[in-house]
Curated annotation (Swiss-Prot):
InterPro entries: Ap4A_hydrolase, Bis(5'-nucleosyl)-tetraP_PrpE, Calcineurin-like_PHP_ApaH, Metallo-depent_PP-like, MPP_PrpE-like
Lineage summary: Bacteria, Bacillati, Bacillota, Bacilli, Bacillales
Keyword Lyase applies: no
Keyword Hydrolase assigned: yes
GO molecular function: bis(5'-nucleosyl)-tetraphosphatase (asymmetrical) activity; nickel cation binding; phosphatase activity
HAMAP family: PrpE
UniProt keywords, alphabetically: Hydrolase, Nickel
Protein name: Bis(5'-nucleosyl)-tetraphosphatase PrpE [asymmetrical]
Gene for this chain: prpE
Reaction(s) catalysed (UniProt annotation): P(1),P(4)-bis(5'-guanosyl) tetraphosphate + H2O = GMP + GTP + 2 H(+)
């Protein structure tokens, strides 16, 4: 099986449509389908900050749950939206407010449909995907070699948030260590979470979050070819979001 792994979309539907078209997918049926039987995989954070979060929920639900023709690994924004839909006490900020505004603008019956679709998508998707006979792992913020195969709380925190130190940047965002430099495994780890100006290959890891929602690009990785394909963002560039990893 060949895969096209998509970086953090954050509600940027137009960029997603442009990228999948560039990757050879047809939208004739209203969702991206590849005639060469390639499958999409998502590194999470499909919602928040961008203009079309609910559209992305519907598309990813259709591909992953209804058609079982794609893979989705939830991100930290997905986790927070899931908790919001469960009625938990979450702070509606850091991008969640845009998704909530879209959601609250819907009539109640459509709200229920979106809520049920996302809860199902989240609950039926693993923390990370191990694909291609264990040669490929798709996850949100990365994973250490010795964590692969585990599902405990420590691993969940790492996969959703990265190798956080507990310290904060001046803007309140967490300081993260560069775990990829220490990775010695043969399995390819494809992830996102931390915006970079260009896809970042370090050892057998690739960060494909090129900051579409911050005016960068939306990037996909063709696997096993290990070729990156990007489309430009239509949103304003926010340079401070593209900081060094550590």
């Amino acid at each position: 099986m060949k895969y096209d792994i998509i970086g953090d979309i954050h509600g940027c539907f137009q960029e997603f449509q442009d990228l999948t078209t560039k990757l050879g997918y047809s939208w004739d049926s209203g969702i991206p389908i590849h005639n060469a039987k390639r499958r999409l995989a998502f590194v999470g954070d499909i919602t928040d900050r961008g203009p079309h979060s609910l559209r992305m929920i519907e598309i990813v639900w259709e591909l992953v749950i209804n058609r079982k023709d794609a893979y989705y690994a939830p991100g930290n924004h997905c986790n927070k939206l899931y908790r919001f839909f469960l009625g938990r006490n979450v702070t509606i900020a850091h991008g969640l407010e845009t998704t909530v505004a879209e959601y609250e603008a819907l009539p109640s019956n459509k709200q229920q449909i979106i809520k049920e679709k996302f809860i199902t998508l989240y609950e039926q998707s693993p923390l990370y995907h191990i694909l291609d006979e264990k040669n490929l792992t798709v996850c949100h913020a990365g994973i250490r070699q010795d964590y692969i195969g585990r599902q405990d709380k420590k691993v969940q925190t790492f996969v959703l948030y990265g190798d956080i130190t507990g310290e904060k940047h001046p803007d309140g965002s967490p300081v993260r260590q560069d775990w990829a430099k220490e990775y010695k495994g043969e399995t390819w780890i494809v992830y996102g979470h931390t915006p970079v100006n260009e896809p970042r290959f370090v050892n057998h890891t690739v960060n494909i979050d090129t900051g579409a929602v911050f005016g960068g690009k939306l990037t996909g990785l063709r696997y096993p070819e290990l070729e990156t394909v990007s489309v430009p963002s239509s949103l304003p560039f926010v340079p401070e979001k593209f900081r060094p990893i550590s």
